[in-house]
Amino acid sequence: MAQESWKKEAEETGVHTPEAPILCVNNCGFFGSRMTENMCSKCYRDTVKAKTVATVVEKKPLASLSSTPLVTEVTDGGSGSVADGKQVMEEDTPKPPSNRCLSCRKKVGLTGFKCRCGGTFCSMHRYADSHKCTFDYKQVGREQIAKQNPLVKADKITKI
């Protein structure tokens, strides 16, 4: 009875079990299956991992080319040659965020307050007047108001 139902399922789904077990393609001694391209589970996992690493490696050089530092050549006045054979490399390495107050050097951790001047301060020095902030809040405020409220000039009215 059970064998008949298995045969019916195999006919309906179109999946047939092989008559003889298939050895792994990589000759590791284990049996493979059609779902894993005739490889055992370990060999299949290794090949999938290798394929994903290969695709990541192919994509990575494209990203690294765009983020490479700029190389500029310093030339003499009119000779057109590179001065002393040196090349100047510009690197923009972002600094890690500071976890200390810039005024008192107290550790602030996650409770630090970031100022518009670019510093991190403790609760005592978080205000602009307490840490002698160099950021011009008034000028930035004026610029924001000017952007948000453009000057509207109407056309002159012609008198009849």
Curated annotation (Swiss-Prot):
List of residues binding Zn(2+) 3: 115, 117, 131, 133
Zinc fingers (AN1-type), renumbered ranges: 95-141
Record flagged with keyword Ion transport: no
Chain sites annotated for binding Zn(2+) 2: 101, 104, 122, 125
Keyword Zinc: yes
Region Disordered, residue ranges: 73-94
Zinc finger (A20-type): 18-52
Induction summary: By dehydration and salt stress.
Assigned keywords, A-Z: Metal-binding, Stress response, Zinc, Zinc-finger
Protein name per UniProt: Zinc finger A20 and AN1 domain-containing stress-associated protein 6
Organism the protein comes from: Oryza sativa subsp. japonica
Gene from which the chain derives: SAP6
